[in-house]
Amino acid sequence: TDGHQAAAPQVGDPQAGEAKANGVCLACHGPQGNSLVPIWPKLAGQHPEYIVKQLMDFKQRRANEQMTPMAMPLTDQEVLDLAAYYATQPKTPGAADPELASKGESLYRWGNPETGVPACSGCHGPAGGAGQSLAKFPRLSAQHADYTKQTLEHFRGALRANDPNGMMRGAAARLSDQEIAAVSQYLQGLSQ
């Protein structure tokens, strides 16, 4: 060999993550990562890569009144452990307003060519349940509509800017308030 060894993959321990989650994250993100408060995200079933990205962003550069102080003291291993734990937890689906969800489904699947809104499904998967783990695009199914709405509004107003190459800011800038409400309801009602 040439004397170089490949770096060992960084892997989280779900059991250690559960202990940390129950001590630090439970109050806001709920049992098993299913937040009971609609403005706080559900973490259950999320890609571990996405959770790691978000926690590291909070630790390094993303200012957030609630999350930055919670993430700062976490070690890199604790971040991996939390991500591994939440990724294995089942999501609790929500109910959606049927009329809004129908409009949101169309926008999610096909976008709005008239205003240049891209289809959400292009990055987040055909039913919101897949996302793309390697690209760190999140799973969106069963997420609280209030949280999704707030997130899209923050991207639209450039209050949130941790999206690669401004992808979400660009897409959200083209969304109307009605479209944000509709796609948020659609995603909340998905159970995958």
From Swiss-Prot:
Post-translational modification: Binds 2 heme c groups covalently per subunit.
Keywords of this entry: Electron transport, Heme, Iron, Metal-binding, Periplasm, Repeat, Transport
Gene Ontology molecular function: electron transfer activity; heme binding; iron ion binding
Superkingdom to which the source organism belongs: Bacteria
Annotated signal sequence range: none
Entries under Pfam families matching the protein: Cytochrom_C
Record: residues binding heme c 2: 120, 123-124
Subcellular location: Periplasm
Annotated SUPFAM superfamilies: Cytochrome c (SSF46626)
Residue ranges constituting the Cytochrome c domain according to the UniProt record: 12-90, 99-191
UniProt keyword annotation of Transport present: yes
GO cellular component terms attached to this protein's record: periplasmic space
InterPro entries, per the entry: Cyt_c-like_dom, Cyt_c-like_dom_sf, Cyt_C_IC, Cytochrome_c4-like, Cytochrome_c_Oxidase_Subunit
Binding site for heme c 1: 25, 28-29
BP GO annotations: electron transport chain; heme transport
Record's function text: Diheme, high potential cytochrome c believed to be an intermediate electron donor in an anaerobic electron transport chain.
Name of the protein this chain belongs to: Cytochrome c4
The organism of origin for this protein: Thiocapsa roseopersicina
